[in-house]
Amino acid sequence: ADSSTGQLFVSQFAADAQGEVVNELGRYCPSEIIFNEGILDQTEVTAFIQKKLHCVADLCDNDRFDPQAAEDLIARHFSKPSGALGLDGRPLASRALGALLAYLYETQQKGLERITDIAYVNPEQSMALDLTARRNLELTQTMRTGEKRGTLLWVLDRTKTAMGKRLMRAWLDKPLVNPA
């Protein structure tokens, strides 16, 4: 979530999809993440967070991920149930969204009114590029210095606004499998 822009993306992966979670974290490079105790069993994910991500990681109580509390908070914030937001049949995504909203209400003084909708990101709609492929292709940062200059994004980005820049980066980070 980005409370400054109002963007909130939600996704759900299979329980054994540690590699996909790591790739998603690497794609977004969040400055802060929240998680529950269940993630501590996911050694690949925790190792990536500790060694590569360099962000604030906040361990939250499992109570914050309670399904009913999540549903109530989602309904209160968006004025509609999670099913109306496209989260029917996605219980893990609903619980994560509820925990995120609870965390944002607790820590953010303002800006939450900008979050008026969510976008469910279906992992099957975009090409799966792991961290190694993304690094070797130099999509958004060079292998040697980690700079933007010299990357595909640097070559293509002729956008005029910050929102356009974010959209261009999103297109490169998650190319569609079927653009039609």
Regions found by a protein language model. Give the residues of each.
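Charged catalytic and DNA/RNA-contacting regions of genome-maintenance
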Residues: 1-180
